[in-house]
A protein has these predicted regions:
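Short loop/turn microsegments at loop-to-beta-strand junctions
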Residues: 6-7, 29, 129-130
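Hydrophobic beta-strand anchors of alpha/beta hydrolase catalytic cores
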Residues: 30-31, 65, 132
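Structural microenvironment flanking redox-active thiols in thiol-disulfide oxidoreductases
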Residues: 44-104
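Thiol/disulfide oxidoreductase modules built on the thioredoxin-like
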Residues: 100-157
């Protein structure tokens, strides 16, 4: 049986402030792992998750979306700040040392590995798990959303989970 999603992390946000899963108070967390140089999957998923958050209406105030970098060598806080600014939804970019990012990946059971690619910026890409994780306040795992789900389906499931998990 696979290990459960732990949801723990200790990283820095896109302003350089240390954060962990408890830093967002009574808000649910919508967590997506990716990297700023991703050309297709990450921009598409961030747009979809942003649309899902907009579809929540007033409930969106109870959710903090997080974009966790799997490429800490390139994704500094400043790079992530610029990256999340291009995507609606109020995402906070998170990064850290290689060890911190590896610990967060392990906690969420995320696969990501640097692969050489001469055509890519910096000479490599980082294929990674493309799931969004929905966590209760404090970091308890509630659900994950596959890449194949559209924004209305994600919004409906988040609404259902928040109504059953009142603060």
């Amino acid at each position: 049986m696979p290990a459960p999603i732990d949801g723990a992390f200790s990283l820095v946000d896109h302003f350089g402030t240390p954060v962990d899963q408890r830093s967002y108070g009574d808000r649910h967390l919508l967590v997506f792992f990716g990297f700023s140089h991703c050309a297709v999957v990450c921009p598409r998923e961030l747009a979809k998750l942003g649309a899902a958050l907009r579809a929540l209406g007033p409930l969106a105030a109870r959710v903090q979306p997080l974009y966790v970098s799997v490429d800490p060598a390139r994704d500094t806080p400043a790079v992530l700040r610029a990256c999340v600014a291009r995507h609606p939804g109020g995402f906070v970019g998170l990064t850290g040392s290689e060890a911190q990012v590896e610990a967060a990946k392990k906690s969420f059971r995320v696969f990501a590995r640097r692969v050489p690619d001469a055509a890519a910026p910096g000479g490599y890409v980082v294929p990674h798990t493309a799931l969004a994780y929905f966590m209760a306040p404090g970091g308890r795992y509630l659900a994950h959303f596959a890449e194949s789900l559209d924004a209305p389906a994600v919004a409906a499931r988040m609404t259902e989970l928040m109504q059953g998990d009142t603060p």
